[in-house]
């Protein structure tokens, strides 16, 4: 027997729809206010979770009913997910919060085969969804005692800076030049049957990020969760899962000088990751998030093909926009470089895919055929074992890959493109 619980709230458009409002994504010029109606199906006798595994919400967009189906992203967090910050005296504080009953979902719109959704339900509905080929954002309005939410399109957000935002990677080499000696991919029979790649990601936010949020590290942690949830929407069709291994906030001071040169900052972060982070936190990729304004139009940089090399599985990202979707695409782009993908070129026939060299104002959240080919070539040539095995804490800089044969020595210049 199924008991259907309906939370009945009227569906309405805000009477002053179209006026300007300041939301988390910035100043929004055109929006409508809706009151979502939650529809939850519970099995009789089922244990009530704070956040159900599946949920449905109804509301209207432009007068048309929308039924939003949501499923909890159960692979968003690693089992040993951790959060780290520092006390005023510099003591490192690491906690391991329970993350099974979390509030991050992916989904679709009923009767819209091309629809997608990436939503958090932590405090109302917050995120984005694709409906009839157009992308909409939704977030709760901060009105006491109200269930009102704003729904708006990306083009209705006032742009703070029209300057094109670029990835700093310059293409001048082919990925097969990186490793001269191929090695064997040693997988168990079970891993061979289900060869789903898993990126165990640690996000490190520097002091400038903490200052930007006035010391509220929960805001940074939520930003990280939201970005990774959205990145999974991009990566799952590629057979790749992005799993949050941890997030670290430098609440007291930076552990190296964060410079306006993205290249120098990437070098420094990669060095710190080897000497510090990798010795205490299992992961196979790390991304550095900073509010530092990088030189020129650069907002990100990463080592191409560095994912399973202990020295170079890293990238740096500037917090360049208030729009969570664009930040997720930016970090997802740099992780793509770590996975061997280069920039989309004219022949890729996709101007707004994830690996486009510029941050597009209307990204598709898809990878081009070129990106798929680069990734498949990376898997074939590099045999990246770390993507198919849970990472272990290591004190070593490089790992033997076939018997006692070590990786051939690779310099920074080999990876920096």
Curated annotation (Swiss-Prot):
Transmembrane segments: none
Entry keywords, A to Z: Disulfide bond, Hemostasis impairing toxin, Hydrolase, Metal-binding, Metalloprotease, Platelet aggregation inhibiting toxin, Protease, Secreted, Signal, Toxin, Zinc, Zymogen
GO MF, one annotated term: metalloendopeptidase activity
Residues annotated for Zn(2+) binding in this entry: 333, 337, 343
GO CC annotation, single: extracellular region
One of the protein's GO biological processes: proteolysis
EC number: 3.4.24.-
InterPro entries: MetalloPept_cat_dom_sf, Peptidase_M12B, Peptidase_M12B_N, Reprolysin_adamalysin
Expression sites by tissue: Expressed by the venom gland.
Disulfide-linked positions: 308-386, 348-370, 350-353
Xref: Gene3D superfamilies: Collagenase (Catalytic Domain) (3.40.390.10)
Region forming the signal peptide: 1-20
Major location (coarse): secreted
Maturation propeptide residues: 21-189, 392-417
Residue positions of the active site: 334
Cofactor(s) in the UniProt record: Zn(2+)
Domain (Peptidase M12B) ranges: 197-391
Compartments it resides in: Secreted
Bound cofactor: record note: Binds 1 zinc ion per subunit.
Keyword Zinc: yes
Regulation: Inhibited by EDTA, and O-phenanthrolene.
Summary of subunit composition and partner proteins: Monomer.
Chain's role: Snake venom zinc metalloprotease that inhibits platelet aggregation by binding specifically to platelet glycoprotein VI (GP6) and platelet glycoprotein Ib alpha (GP1BA). It inhibits the interaction between collagen and platelet GP6 by cleaving GP6 (at '225-Glu-|-Ala-226' and '238-Val-|-Phe-239' bonds), and inhibits vWF-induced platelet aggregation by cleaving GP1BA and vWF. Cleavage of GP1BA occurs at two distinct sites to generate two soluble fragments. It also cleaves alpha- (FGA) and subsequently the gamma-chain (FGG) of fibrinogen, leaving the beta-chain unaffected.
Assigned protein family: Belongs to the venom metalloproteinase (M12B) family. P-I subfamily.
Name under which the protein is recorded: Snake venom metalloproteinase kistomin
Upper taxonomic lineage: Eukaryota, Metazoa, Chordata, Craniata, Vertebrata
């Amino acid at each position: 027997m199924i008991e259907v619980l309906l939370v009945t709230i009227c569906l309405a458009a805000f009477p002053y729809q179209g006026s300007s409002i300041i939301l988390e994504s910035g100043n929004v010029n055109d929006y409508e206010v809706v009151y979502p109606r939650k529809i939850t199906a519970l099995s009789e006798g089922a244990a009530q979770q704070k956040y159900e595994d599946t949920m449905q919400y109804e509301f209207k967009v432009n007068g048309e009913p929308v039924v939003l189906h949501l499923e909890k992203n159960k692979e968003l967090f690693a089992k040993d997910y951790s959060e780290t910050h520092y006390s005023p005296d510099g003591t490192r504080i690491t906690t391991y919060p329970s993350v099974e009953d979390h509030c991050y979902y992916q989904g679709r719109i009923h009767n819209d085969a091309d629809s997608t959704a990436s939503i958090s339900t932590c405090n109302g509905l917050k995120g984005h969804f694709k409906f009839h080929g157009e992308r909409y954002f939704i977030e709760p309005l901060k009105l006491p005692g109200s269930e009102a939410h704003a729904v708006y399109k990306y083009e209705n957000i006032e742009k703070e800076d029209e300057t094109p935002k670029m990835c700093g990677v310059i293409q001048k080499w082919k990925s097969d030049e990186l490793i001269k000696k191929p090695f064997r991919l040693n997988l168990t029979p079970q891993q061979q049957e289900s060869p789903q790649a898993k990126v165990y990601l640690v996000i490190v936010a520097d002091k400038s990020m903490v200052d930007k949020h006035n010391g509220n590290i929960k805001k940074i942690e939520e930003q990280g969760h939201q970005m990774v949830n959205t990145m999974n929407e991009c990566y799952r069709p590629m057979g790749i899962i992005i799993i949050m291994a941890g997030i670290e906030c430098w609440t007291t001071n930076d552990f190296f000088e964060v410079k306006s040169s993205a290249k120098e900052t990437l070098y420094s972060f990669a060095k710190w990751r080897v000497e510090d982070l990798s010795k205490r936190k299992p992961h196979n990729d790390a991304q550095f998030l900073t509010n530092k304004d990088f030189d020129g139009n650069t907002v990100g940089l990463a080592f191409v093909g560095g994912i399973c090399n202990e020295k170079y599985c890293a990238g740096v990202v500037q917090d360049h926009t208030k729009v969570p979707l664009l930040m997720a695409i930016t970090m997802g782009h740099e992780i793509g470089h770590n996975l061997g993908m280069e920039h989309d070129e004219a022949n890729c026939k996709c101007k707004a895919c994830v690996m486009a060299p510029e941050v597009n104002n209307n990204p598709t959240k898809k990878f081009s055929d070129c990106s798929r080919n680069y990734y498949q070539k990376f898997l074939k040539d590099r045999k990246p074992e770390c993507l198919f095995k849970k990472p272990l804490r290591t004190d070593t800089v490089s790992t033997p890959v076939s018997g006692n044969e070590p990786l051939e020595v690779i310099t920074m210049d080999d990876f920096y493109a």
